[in-house]
């Protein structure tokens, strides 16, 4: 019984250390993701503008197609 308790204590200790290291690494990764560079902001704005223009063009082409075919 005593050796079983020692084994469980050792597993708990090693698991706690591993979990602690993972949390520290995850925290370091999250810190890097917070800062956005100016390039990323510009890229996001350009993508938004491009997608909006694309949706408008598709909508206009659908209306023109509908008028020509008589939907």
UniProtKB/Swiss-Prot annotation:
Prosequence residues removed at maturation: 23-43
A GO-annotated cellular component: extracellular region
Disulphide connectivity of cysteines: 66-71
InterPro entries the UniProt entry points to: Antimicrobial_frog_2 (IPR012521), Frog_antimicrobial_propeptide (IPR004275)
Signal peptide: 1-22
Keywords attached to this entry: Amphibian defense peptide, Antibiotic, Antimicrobial, Cleavage on pair of basic residues, Disulfide bond, Secreted, Signal
Organism domain of life: Eukaryota
Organ and tissue specificity: Expressed by the skin glands.
Compartments, record wording: Secreted
GO process terms (BP): defense response to Gram-negative bacterium; defense response to Gram-positive bacterium
Primary location group: secreted
Chain's role: Antimicrobial peptide.
Family (UniProt): Belongs to the frog skin active peptide (FSAP) family. Ranatuerin subfamily.
Entry protein name: Ranatuerin-2Va
Organism: Odorrana versabilis (Chinese bamboo leaf odorous frog)
